[in-house]
Amino acid sequence: MEPPAGAAATVKDPDHDPVKTKVSAPAADPKPRTSSQKAGHSLQDWDTIATVGTGTFGRVNLVKEKTGRQYCALKIMSIPDVIRLKQEQHVQNEKAVLKEINHPFLIKLLWTGHDNRFLYMLMEFVPGGELFTYLRNRGRFSSVASVFYATEIVCAIEYLHSKEIVYRDLKPENILLDREGHIKLTDFGFAKKLVDRTWTLCGTPEYLAPEVIQSKGHGRAVDWWALGILIFEMLSGFPPFFDDNPFGIYQKILACKIDFPRQLDFTSKDLIKKLLVVDRTRRLGNMKNGAEDIKRHRWFRGVEWESVPQRKLKPPIVPKLSGDGDISNFETYPESELDKTPSVSDKDLETFKNF
């Protein structure tokens, strides 16, 4: 089986010297409105150091406390773009979910606010960079490394599900490594509190579960499907279903014909097959015993699950860092053009009055 074109694309080497680029922050409202104001958390208290991530309607900046030594990540979202792309509910969902969760493997939200152009979310800075970068630089992970990351992810997803939250965007790009090498799930824009099944088509094509594609309504089971895709990708270096266009990917997902690379052993393949079951009622993790069925699978043999959330397992990769504000494990980005973002009317701003 050949990986998709570009699967081993060159990405930034995490071992080079940290970038010291100084970028300008957007010219914000001098008195941004905040809905979760805490002492020491306002835009005026932070200096922007560099951009460490970009998205469809904003970016994430590394910021440093002016009067102290704390570094944080500031997510800045353009309100006009959020409105244009009809992402208001996703943004509100992200804030609501982040306010509710507290887990060692999930990113922490510290503060939110807005002015008449931007929404702001101040979060802990996780300096190790994306798991995606390490996976692409190495080609694929060993079985030992894959078990470690899957173990911490299972605990994180199980916790979210216990809170009636479905994550819906599990992929290597959304898994950060902290300074010790433990994971932090980030980007909760697609996360949703479950009251009943949901029908929204969202997520990354290669990781979408069949029931999402078929608009049958979906719940927790989509996260366990994505875990199966992730385990396959960690062990092989590429996802099991790929094509030049999303519709081709969707067709392959629905057919669910998995071509396993030769290096995958029987136990790995058995777990992946049980996670990548089109019928969600038979999918591992979504049956009567829930996540316990996954934990008991022999691929995880030897894992002391009670020690996992205590961060007692030894990480296979420890990020190289020169200091607290080291951004060498992240891509470099061009200087921000956020100052060109127009302001919005009071009517449009009403949607975000409690943000």
Curated annotation (Swiss-Prot):
Example of a GO biological process term: endothelial cell proliferation
Coiled-coil blocks: none
Compartments it resides in: Cytoplasm; Nucleus
Gene Ontology molecular function: ATP binding; cAMP-dependent protein kinase activity; protein serine kinase activity; protein serine/threonine kinase activity
All copies of domain AGC-kinase C-terminal, residue ranges: 301-355
SUPFAM superfamilies tied to this protein: Protein kinase-like (PK-like) (SSF56112)
UniProt keywords, alphabetically: Acetylation, Angiogenesis, ATP-binding, cAMP, Cytoplasm, Developmental protein, Differentiation, Kinase, Nucleotide-binding, Nucleus, Phosphoprotein, Serine/threonine-protein kinase, Transferase
Disulfide cysteine pairs (residue numbers): none
Biased composition (Basic and acidic residues): 337-355
PANTHER family in the cross-refs: CAMP-DEPENDENT PROTEIN KINASE CATALYTIC SUBUNIT PRKX (PTHR24353:SF37), CYCLIC NUCLEOTIDE-DEPENDENT PROTEIN KINASE (PTHR24353)
Function: Serine/threonine protein kinase regulated by and mediating cAMP signaling in cells. Acts through phosphorylation of downstream targets that may include CREB, SMAD6 and PKD1 and has multiple functions in cellular differentiation and epithelial morphogenesis. Regulates myeloid cell differentiation through SMAD6 phosphorylation. Involved in nephrogenesis by stimulating renal epithelial cell migration and tubulogenesis. Also involved in angiogenesis through stimulation of endothelial cell proliferation, migration and vascular-like structure formation.
Similarity remark: Belongs to the protein kinase superfamily. AGC Ser/Thr protein kinase family. cAMP subfamily.
Protein name: cAMP-dependent protein kinase catalytic subunit PRKX
UniProt source species: Mus musculus (Mouse)
Underlying gene: Prkx
